[in-house]
UniProtKB/Swiss-Prot annotation:
Gene: hisG
Gene Ontology molecular function terms on file: ATP binding; ATP phosphoribosyltransferase activity
EC number per UniProt: 2.4.2.17
Keyword Transmembrane: no
Principal localisation: cytoplasm
Role summary: Catalyzes the condensation of ATP and 5-phosphoribose 1-diphosphate to form N'-(5'-phosphoribosyl)-ATP (PR-ATP). Has a crucial role in the pathway because the rate of histidine biosynthesis seems to be controlled primarily by regulation of HisG enzymatic activity.
Top-level division of the source organism's lineage: Bacteria
Oligomeric form and interacting partners: Heteromultimer composed of HisG and HisZ subunits.
Name of the molecule in the record: ATP phosphoribosyltransferase
Comment on protein domains: Lacks the C-terminal regulatory region which is replaced by HisZ.
Catalytic activity: 1-(5-phospho-beta-D-ribosyl)-ATP + diphosphate = 5-phospho-alpha-D-ribose 1-diphosphate + ATP
Compartment list: Cytoplasm
InterPro entries: ATP_PRibTrfase_cat, ATP_PRibTrfase_CS, ATP_PRibTrfase_HisG, ATP_PRibTrfase_HisG_short
Keyword ATP-binding: yes
Amino acid sequence: MLTIAIPKGGLLPEAIALLQQVGLDFSAFLDKKNRQLQITDPTGTARAMLVRTHDVPVYVEYGQAQLGFAGYDVLREKKPDVANLLDLGFGGCRLSVAVPKASPYKNPRQLPPNCRVASKFVNCAKDYFRDLDLPIEVIPLHGSVELGPITGMSEAIVDLVSTGNTLRENNLEEVEVLFHSTVRLIAHPTSYRANRHNMLDWVQKLEQIL
């Protein structure tokens, strides 16, 4: 049976709505009383696993799910061995460098060598500043990255931005966009090549409604 890894949180409703358009109903995940992490479509055609956003590519890479919905930001950070098949067009955001509004640095290239940058996206931040040939120390954080500059722990942050409201409320401003991100359909490469569980048919159905 085809298994699809879908992300918890804000991306879940749109992921479920998209799957409903191709005949797969996992809306039970939207029931607040639901505690199941894996459910089967009422037709018995496929099952879905509800996992954390950053874990979607892990389950796909290791073959526990044949398909998954993963943010491009997660794929850039984790660099998993998966096939990136389709841009699903929702969950739009961008990964940006931000500094305090009062900062004298209005461009990442102006940051002093060996300064500190706080981020959840450690690999993306390191890759970006390496390309600039600017040595920096990346401080890994898992939440409230904005506190880095506020507390003086870092001169800048690299973080996801959607509306920019959180930055503004914390007196931070974007100075550079690293890349834009949307949710992608990913697949386990070997399963996809072998067309396990008619994966190609489902991918084509999704492609047709985009």
